Amino acid sequence: MTSSTDSNLTLIPSPGDKVEITCLDLDRHGNGLARWNNWVVIVNDLLPGESAQIEFVRRHRNQFLARKVQTIETVASRRPPPCKIAKECGGCSIQHLSDHGQTLLKQGHLRQILLRLGQLDHKIEPIMTDYNRALGYRNRALIPLYRNSEGQLHMGYYRRGSHQIIDLNRCPVLDRGIDQYLASIKDDLQQQNWPADSDLSSGEGLRHLGIRIGQKTKQVLITLVSSTTQLSGLHQQAKEWYSRWPEVRGITLNIQRQRNNLVLGQETILLAGDLEIEEHFYNLSLLLSTTTFFQVNTLQAERIVSKLIEWLSTASLDINIIDAYCGIGTISLPIAATGYHVIGLELHAEAITQANKNALRNSLDNVSFLCGDVSLLLAKKLQRNDVLVLDPPRKGLDQMVIKTILSIQPERVAYLSCDPATLARDLKQLIVPNGPYQIDELQPIDFFPQTMHIECLALLTRISS
């Protein structure tokens, strides 16, 4: 091993070499980024502006992974993580950064990405955040399960960069109404002795525990995700939970036999109570099932819908609002409640079924939902005078969707993105000089405090043909 002084190192470091570095930024996983002799160095638990002695661990392509040996200088934005297992758990990556520090970091990252990938130098509004809800904001948990060869059940999220489970009995980012069940359910699952393996590497059995809560109604839905229905005493255990906790409205078993990155399967079996819970969202009553996609941060989702409705308020009620990638109607239904006629487009049939059910539940007859390939449906339904709302998955817009927008040129477009990189790519094609639109506003939203994720709403207006 070489000495700890930089002068004794060759231009290409070796594992075990030690140097002093200063952190320049964080990567998308929350790891510190630094440079040494033109090499990118990745080291955990280091914030921008902090310096430390690090030890090189291994080379990965044109980067070096390193571990922090000793902190030399810290920044004022560092804080003790609210969670005692934050340094090990892969669920949250920046709990050690203050709430204000997280806001500044995310604002800067969004600006860098839009400028680098989209050549977009537009004003970005202050991040829509709520420091009072930086913890306890998640309305849903999907927690891996594993029983080892000694029969001990492990329940928790994965250790950073591995499939090893870090046990937990509470999680600070989960709604406290979820937290209260974790320890008791874990104890009961331990006693039941059912096999459990989240990634099916050792056979069939339980894979995940799911808990969903209506943050306004406090109703709870508990789900066991399993690769098999052969779990002795399952119904009795479900009935016992149902009678033990009045807030629990349903217990379900979701079957997921596939070894992929999808936690939930398509088949859900009712064990006790009801298949759905009620949640109040933007003055509407919504039914949510085990597999319903619903924003995990209810209050922030309401705030972004409010922003959209405010933006729409100057539009004539005679136009159509086309909501592409509408899901269960989280955006469509509140807009319809203001009087606009809304057409929702969605690929997944189950989501459309729930959207129609929720429209009927709220007596909204000015909204309709169509199931199919969104790019094909949009080409058939979009008109020039319409307002288009886009809420695509992380991969962004299909090229056919962009071609349809550029061909028909609806008057206004709202694009809610969960990935700034694909947002930058898509906006570059829609904005002058490549397209007919100008940006009215870029509004970032922090749906996931304590993580590196940032979402952004782009509001566009047609200015040329």
UniProtKB/Swiss-Prot annotation:
Which EC number(s) does the record attach to this protein?
2.1.1.-
Asked if Iron is a keyword of the record, the answer is: yes
Which of this chain's residues are annotated to bind S-adenosyl-L-methionine? Q295, Y325, E346, D391
Mind telling me which Gene3D superfamilies this protein's record contains? 2.40.50.1070, Nucleic acid-binding proteins, Vaccinia Virus protein VP39
What PROSITE patterns does the record tag this protein with?
Answer: SAM_MT_RNA_M5U, TRAM, TRMA_1, TRMA_2
Q: Name one GO molecular function term.
A: metal ion binding
Q: Where is the TRAM domain?
A: 12-70
Q: Which GO terms describe its biological process?
A: rRNA base methylation
**UniProt-annotated catalytic positions:** C418
The residues the record assigns to binding [4Fe-4S] cluster are: C83, C89, C92, C171
The set of disulfide-linked cysteines is none
Highest taxon in the source lineage: Bacteria
CDD domains attached here? AdoMet_MTases
Keywords for the protein's UniProt record, in alphabetical order: 4Fe-4S, Iron, Iron-sulfur, Metal-binding, Methyltransferase, S-adenosyl-L-methionine, Transferase
Give the similarity note: Belongs to the class I-like SAM-binding methyltransferase superfamily. RNA M5U methyltransferase family.
Protein name from the UniProt record:
Uncharacterized RNA methyltransferase PMT_0737
Q: Which organism is it from?
A: Prochlorococcus marinus (strain MIT 9313)
